[in-house]
Amino acid sequence: MGKIILLFLVSLVGLVGCGKKESRAGEVSTPKPKIQEPLPEDAEERYKVAYIRAAQAFSRNDLEGALTSLEISDQAKPKQASNANLRGAIFTRKRDWVKAEEAFRLALQLQPDLPMAQFNLGEVLFLNNKYPEAREKFQIFLNSQPKNDLGLYKMYLCDLLAGNSSKANDYLSTLKPDPMSPIYYFAKAAEAFHQGDKVAATEFVSSAYRIYPPDANSTFADSLVEKGYLTGEQMTAPTQDENKVKSEELKTLLPPVEKSGSKPKS
């Protein structure tokens, strides 16, 4: 399975980090068990701290711990869109689609202009092959972030997989290689996979991994994994350093891209 891309907010209010202390010569340093500080009594601060702990637990994939902290955050300050959005992200990772969709819809009821919840709800619908509904949510997300490549890519995939070949082809024709984003290569790979041309698709994916950082690629490759076109191993295929195009060189190899016209038709 892929690592589903979800968006949520972590506001580290008043979080202070402690630096590592050097151990004395000859001493063996052993890590001390981490003791969590008591939650603040003030309701607003309690809500914030518990939310941050929930987000941190989510990032460690401690999903039950994240839900526990969210319950505390909810009790301190009920009906918060950020809490509902994070709860949806947790249930998405647990692949509990019903609860995930319910949580994201609640987040949007509480805060209709929350772009993260629009994207995340679109992702759940996309993963469940509800492409027209997913496209609608990604479109709303893009209304607030019109140049977001991941949102544009998701819109394109919705058109491609729903059989809206005219819209998909129109958007694909606007794309060119971009030194800042692998969207061109993964959109072309998706088209090739959809047409059954695995050789061409794999070449586009390999080209992306030769050019762009792994994190940038995995964001786009995830959707191809979720749809069964790629495996997790293929997402991290090693490339030789001497064959990898450096980012400085890439800027001279690829033409500048006009992104203003690179938006799928509504």
Give the positions of each predicted feature.
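Register position in tetratricopeptide repeats
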Residues: 59-60, 93-94, 127-128, 161, ...
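Canonical tetratricopeptide repeat
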Residues: 85-86, 120, 154-155, 187
